[in-house]
Design a protein with these regions (language model features):
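Short, linear, compositionally biased motifs with a strong N-terminal bias
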Residues: 10-11
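Positively charged n-region of N-terminal signal peptides that target proteins for export
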Residues: 1-4
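Exposed beta-sheet edge and beta->alpha loop/turn motif
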Residues: 91-143
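N-terminal signal peptide c-region/cleavage motif recognized by signal peptidases
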Residues: 14-16
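Short solvent-exposed beta->alpha transition segments
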Residues: 25, 31-32, 50-99
Length: 143
């Protein structure tokens, strides 16, 4: 019995360590989320961008926080090199049937741009953030 209770406690604690506890209801909601986060990046409101994603992102909170901290550091460093942000641009939307979507945005700066990629996955409850990444290699978007 003690082993069962301990196992149940560990399961509950480990589940609560994950940030994701909500679902996006449809594709327009995923599109709105991507646009909102891209705009928050443009405004250099990185914490708010990660706060917007985390309820839908099934990663442990400490991993999201670590990614957020690194992103704040590097975006600030990049901004010194590539100037002030001047806008966002949606580059493309890719799909795998009706179960996965990847949206790509550029945050434009005076001298260059950074690329944001959002991947959403549809499960039985709705859409979740399956992945989010950003980099400064937007040139890979040329076809």
């Amino acid at each position: 019995m003690k082993r069962f209770i301990l196992s149940l406690f560990v399961l509950v604690v480990s589940m609560s360590a994950f940030a994701q506890d909500d679902y996006l209801k449809d594709i327009p909601a995923t599109e709105a989320m991507s646009k909102k986060v891209a705009e928050l990046f443009r405004q250099n409101k990185i914490k708010l961008a990660f706060d917007a994603l985390s309820p839908y992102w099934p990663l442990p909170e400490n991993e999201i926080e670590s990614s957020e901290e690194k992103t704040i550091k590097y975006v600030n460093m990049l901004s010194d090199r590539i100037g002030s942000p001047i806008g966002i641009l949606k580059v493309k939307t890719e799909t795998i049937g009706d179960i996965a979507i990847r949206e790509t945005y550029l945050v434009r700066y005076e001298v260059s741009a950074i690329r944001l990629k959002f991947t959403y996955y549809k499960n039985e409850d709705g859409w979740i953030v399956n992945g989010f990444m950003w980099d400064d290699t937007f040139s890979e978007e040329f076809e």
